[in-house]
Amino acid sequence: MTGLLLVLLYHFFKTAFPGGFIGVDIFFTFSGYLITALLIDEYSKNKKIDLLGFYKRRFYRIVPPLVLMILIVMPFTYLVRKDYVASIGSQIAAAVGFTTNFYEIITGGNYETQFIPHLFVHTWSLAIEMHFYLIWGLLVWFLSKHHDNVAKFRSLIFTISAAFFAGSFLSMFIRAFFVDNVSTIYFSSLSHSFPFFLGAMVATMTGIRETTARFKKNVRLWSTKRSILTMVLSFALLLLLTFALKFDQRITYLFGFVLASLFSTMMIYAARVLNDQTPNAKEPAIINYLADVSYGVYLFHWPFYIIFTQLMSNGLAVLVTVIFSLIFSTLSFYVLEPFLAGKSVKLLGLNLDLHPYQKWLYGGGTLLGLVTIVTIIISPAVGDFETSLLVNSLQQAQTNLNRTHTVTAGDATALSDVTVIGDSVALRSSASFSSLLPDAQVDAAVSRNFDDAFEIFQNEISSGTLSQTTVLAVGVNSLDNYQEDLQQFIDALPDGYRLIIVTPYNANNKAQVKEVRDYELTLADTYNYVTVADWYKAATKHPEIWSGTDGVHYSDSDTTGADLYVKAIQKAIEKSAKNPAKGESDS
């Protein structure tokens, strides 16, 4: 439940809990422990492992809730714009085929910065989990066929787990130094599977029914207080990581994920000791209930949250998401899963006989299936948002090409002394740049951050092509370490040049963007050659341009948003021209 809590906090309140994504690693560690411990117990009891039975149990636990989630979510997609169902057929195929992680890598997905988030991107973790179940179950079964000593069997599993853990972790550690998009590491079945094997190592040292002599000794030697304090300490350390880690920081991949997994093993071990120390204690019913529905809540919460945040405030969206997720995950665990497995159905202490209602159940499932099929058929391959960005990119390229031809022909005055280095917001404003600032050189791209922009900035300085005024419009993708990032532009700016910084805006992250904006205003006070184009101020004054948007890219139903954006930059350019350039004194 700790893992689910951190994931929910991260998704619902990412600014306050930036490292909550480690909740998935807690899931992975616990799954590795639980599956391995159960397999060892089965071998200890029966001297063999029923591989097909293992796969069957995993299938009934994982697949029905997943399919139910997809079927239930599809009708809700008609409440939001079609961008959210673009290529939905491919997303569904990846989800039910347990290849979402590969799908996101191939399509260039970024876990944190998708402007139109995929509704089923969260099933990437389910894909890696299924890969682990398939391979690990087969390997442990194979080992059980060739060993008849439980102690040696445990020892061998520990050794192999340790080797797999080391290989997977080293893969993440080394790749962290060489990739530009860390999501390719995060989504990787190879690089991100080490928590499972760390959990498996703990399973060989503890077990569930069949435990080790060392573990039994610790149960006797540890006080109950020590067990509880160890659990509390491990939870506190995980919470500390939740506040300290950032998704795109290298240290997260070098040490963050492995520390989260290690702290999770501490919690698992202490919980197992405490469980055996208090055999007659009963867990509160609410704890058992949350443990039962946690998988379902994980499945349902993300698509519901994405949809509801487009319809209401974040706080209300969180409340509605939690309610809907609990309702459907409860029905899934207590009704659907046992019904499909041929077991008795029991809900709220009542035995339910669903056989008289089979036609209604199958009819409802068929109807939802038809809705899903129709949605797949009518959904666009590419959403309007991506299409508009593509069109703007082509327009930008053509405009820059025309300017190059003009300069080559000898008319040097055709190219102004203003260059805009921008992100997708600037790219979305290409048409307005052409009409309001036709002489400005615009270089904009999707998901561009300060690091990308600084590379362009340095290249222009080195090649002697830097315009007299550079407009830096990339802040919304660079909300971490912004002070250092901005300072490098100021320090590198040559004498005789001016810098304009466009303040960022994100309706879903106002607190952090305001913090960045306030700091950027201080830079204009400190350096007379730095001017601020206050897009944040213009954006907050015009809420009408944000209706039905992602909160970062204004509505393109008309040119209002684009014109406001470019006019803010235009105003700053005019103001900057009246101020001295770097190295010049005030007149």
Describe every region a protein language model picked out.
Residues 28, 97, 419-420, 440-444, ...:
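Structural recognition of the beta-strand scaffold that forms the well-ordered cores
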Residues 26, 144, 436-439, 487-489:
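Glycine-rich, phosphate-binding/catalytic loops in enzymes
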Residues 462-465, 490-496:
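Short, conserved loop/helix-junction motifs that constitute active-site signature segments
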